Structure formats: structure tokens, C-alpha cells
Amino acid sequence: MTRIALGAFLHETNTFAPTKATYADFVHGGGWPAMSSGRDVPKMMRCMNAGLAGFIEAAEAEAWDLVPTIACGASPSAHVTKDAFERIVNVIVDGIASARPLDGVYLDLHGAMVTEHFDDGEGELLARVRKVIGEELPLVASLDLHANVTPKMVEHADALIAYRTYPHIDMANTGRAAARHLALLLKTKKRFAKAFRQLAFLIPINWQATLDEPAKSIYERLAALESRAVPTLSFAPGFPAADFEHCGASVFAYGRTQQDANAAADAIVALVESHEDDFYGKIYSPDEGVCHAMECAKTATRPIVIADTQDNPGAGGNSDTTGMLRALVRNKAQAAALGVIYDPQSAKAAHAAGQGASVRLALGGKSGIRGDAPYQQTFVVENISGGDFVATGPYYGGRAMQMGPSAALRIGDVRVVVASHKAQLADQSMYRYVGIEPTAQKILVNKSSVHFRADFEPIAAKLLICAAPGAMPADPASLPWTRLRPGIRLRPNGPAFTPATKAPITG
């Protein structure tokens, strides 16, 4: 029987964010399932939109004998601590070593992890696994669409396969694709030639959305280029908030011959470069966006949905800035709701006050973001919740969410979801679990960039993007870069990065 070791370790690192990812964050998971290990992994990772879940489903259909090590992820943030990285990687590597003899290894990774002691978290992990399994055993990994792929990652994996949708509704499908490629490697007992290309400009995350052009057509062309000669081809637009040499978009292809791989990769690079002008769109200030939403809402029959993109916890934001809340209240928005503000202290105070009570709070604004501060006002506690529910929309895809003590607060006709844990508001259930019906609102403000669109676009009359203070600037050129590779453009057609000096890793 074919014997495959597997594991999952996912983190998207914004090196400019205020909060690091500790081991406890991986234990809880944030928007990811809670940490599981050994035989508990397949029990936990079923019937959900996750790479590991899709791989397990496909592997069981092949009747492979699976040897799980550990599965965990944490909300995007600043660097993964050395303690967390070493503890989790040791479980993976030791588990793989003790599972031998093996026929192959699969890892579900993000591809944009930076740690306190390594710029390239996934490259380091893959190198350690390769050292244990040797050069002959196939090693395949699935990656996030936002992966900052490095030469080290490409070197040590036999195949890297990235998501093709943003919102990421194909995470499980990517795991299935990884299983198919691993099966092909096992059947043919041959390695494919690799081609790896890095693009010359950073792509803002809002314009990486595959529901829109130019990404939509790029991924359609990418799928059409796959064949028996090129069994897998990926384009990762990257995560433009990790200050290290290999931050940015990349293309990676696997072909029967080097010529096949090179031709496929170069075709996608040329297509992306031809659309450099198109990775751009309208971004509103908080007041401008709220006023425009209020005007649209006068005639709309469905909610106007605003992305509070710069405080997106799915991109390293702390999900606690108050700029959009202030704009809603200042402009006297009606039938408006905002979520999720991460503030355990305020959630605790709301629970202590009780449903129906009025409570004075210093809400949010505790992460030290420049231009932001706690919002000190009196709120009505409309509802409270323990924070456990299932997110049923296309992005989370059935994940059990654990937001901790939570509440629906009201000020004027603006309602706010406050929670004790942070997760990107990408599911309608993240309003409903505290008693707010999203379809009944005129305006919704979601702390998200793109993932919310999977569940909210069907109920929205219009989508807007606003830039209130936050850790993930919509324009990557506004970040204080010091360690990128020389010459890379900081936005499409933007200024080129010129390093003052070679800076050391900063954790």
C-alpha cells in the first residue's frame, strides 16, 4: 500500500503588522481549524474548504495509507515566533522521520511565512523535510495564491501548486490537484522539469481578485496551458507586505521537458506583464466611501458592502481599528453594521453589562496603528454570544469558528460585532451569530479585502473599497520597505525599490 506522510502549517506574514504569531495562536487557529495532530488530523480536516481536506479526500479514494503529523494555521500577522516555528516544524520533521518507510510526502503550506529567525519559513521547512526523506522521495506542497515563492521552495519540492481563486474557494480543490500530481509522480517514477519566474512589480491584494480582470483571464489562460506536457502551472500574485528579498508575484511550471516548462511559465509572465496597467482600481477615503454608500442605499434594495481593506485580519491587520466606525457614526449612517472588531476587553464588558444594557467603552484601537485610537462612546448591548458557530459560506466552507465571548453593540443606527478572537469577516454567519441579519442592513462594512466577496457579492447591490488606518496599506508603495530585491516596482508602474544598505532580518 502506498504510504504518504502529510502535514499542514500555514501563516501569511505581514512584517509591518503590530502583532506576532505565537504557538498559542496556532493552537487556537483564528480563522483556521484548531491545531490537531496524529490520527486526529483526518477527523478534524474533513468536509471543509482547506488544502489538506481536499488532499485527504483524494488520497483516501486512492486507498493510500496516510500518516498525519500535525495540522495548524494562525491568522495573518507579523513574524511567526521562533518558538512556534521550531515546535511545529519539529513535529512535522520528526513525524515524517518516524513514519519511514514512505512513498511520498504532502504538505499544505501558505508560502508567505516569515519567522523571527528565517525570511523564508516554508523554504526552511521544505529543506528540513528533504534532508530527512532524501532526494528520491516525492515531496509535493499546495500553496496559497498569495505565496511569496522563493528559489529555496522550488528547489526542495518536486511540485508546488497554488490556489487559482481569490476569494480562495478552491483550497480543497488545490489539495486534490496536489494528490493527482503526487499520484502521477508515483506512477511514472519520473521528475518533471521546473521553471520559476519572478515578476518585476508588486500587485496590490485588492486587484488580485480572480472575479475581475485582469486576473480572471490570466487564470483562464493558465488552465488552458496545462497538458500532458505541462501537468501543473501556477501563478502566485504574492503577498506584498513581507519585507524580504523574494516578496512578490511569481510563476512556476512543471513540464516533461525543460523547454515545456519554460514555454508555459514565460507565456504567463508575458500575459501578466501585458496587464500591468490593469491591476488598479478606485479606493475611497472613509468619509467618501460612507457618503457614497449612503447615497447608493437610497435606491438600492440590497446592502452596499464596504471593504475595510487596510484592517483586514486576513492580511495582518489586527481587526481593531475604528476609522470606518467613526465615519459611519459621524455621517449618521442608517441601518449599518460593521465587523469584526477584535477587542476582548470590550466583549467582556458587554457580557458583564448584559443584553439591553448601555455600557461606556473604549472600543478597539488598541494595536497602536498610526492615526487610530480607541473609540470612547456609550453603546447599547443588543446581543451577546459565546462565539461558537459554523461558517457556511464558500470561503470558510463549513469551518467551526471560535470567536470567544462576543457581542452586537449599537450606537445610533450603527451595529458593531465585537469579538474576543479575530478572523476575517468573509461569511454572513459572522454577523448572524450575534443576531445581526446582514441582508436587512443598508450598509455593511467588512474587515476584509476580497474574501468577503464569495459570500457577500450575491447579496450586495454594490461593493466599495475604503482605506481607513490599518496595517495592510492598499498601496504597497506606501510601506517602509528596506529589504526587497533591487529594482522591483513597488506597485504596477510604480517607483522601483532602491536599497539604502543591506538590512539584516528583523523580527
Task: Identify the function of each model-found stretch.
Residues 56-84, 88-96:
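Low-complexity, highly charged intrinsically disordered N-terminal segments
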Residues 186-216:
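Internal, active-site/partner-interface "lid" segment
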Residues 2, 206-413, 417-421:
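Hard-cation-handling environments
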Residues 1-58:
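N-terminal amphipathic/basic leader segments beginning at the initiator methionine
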Residues 1, 60-68, 94-103, 290-304, ...:
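Glycine-rich phosphate/diphosphate-binding loops that line cofactor/substrate pockets in enzymes
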Residues 3-5, 65-67, 103-105, 137-141, ...:
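Structural motif
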Residues 68, 273, 390-507:
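Extended hydrophobic packing segments that form well-structured cores
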Residues 5-12, 17, 26-27, 76-78, ...:
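Active-site histidine-anchored catalytic micro-motif
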